[in-house]
């Protein structure tokens, strides 16, 4: 049986910095949350049928989208997460989500991103536990 491609494989086929960045983000997420579930959702013509990589653990942690000039990492419950390093720089006005827009040439603060991912896992897990 052929092994299923990772969600990022199709995005790496972009052949540019966006695919490389998404692969880097994926590696950081997997290091921060080794039990994370990866899926591709929302395939449609507007994203060349690549879909959107989604990382979950007891609920969606974040999604990774590629646009023409940005890789967007959206945390489903980002508004509820502590962000002392101020990684969130997009979708700041809402009550639920927060996003990190990464432009070509920008570096990722791995330590801060891992802390956000671990915080998202803890939040998702705590919401599942009922007294």
Model region roles, listed by residue range:
Residues 1-131:
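Charge-dense, helix-prone N-terminal extensions
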């Amino acid at each position: 049986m052929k092994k299923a491609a990772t969600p990022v494989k199709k995005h790496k086929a972009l052949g540019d910095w966006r695919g490389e960045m998404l692969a880097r983000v994926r590696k950081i997420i997997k290091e921060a949350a080794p039990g994370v579930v990866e899926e591709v959702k929302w395939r449609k013509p507007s994203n060349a049928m690549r879909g959107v990589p989604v990382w979950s653990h007891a609920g969606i942690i974040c999604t990774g989208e590629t646009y023409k000039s940005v890789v967007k990492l959206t945390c489903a419950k980002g508004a509820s997460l502590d962000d002392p390093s101020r990684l969130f720089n997009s979708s700041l006005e809402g009550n639920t989500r927060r996003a990190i827009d990464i432009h070509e040439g920008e570096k990722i603060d791995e330590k801060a991103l891992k802390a956000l991912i671990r915080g998202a896992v803890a939040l998702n897990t705590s919401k599942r536990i009922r007294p």
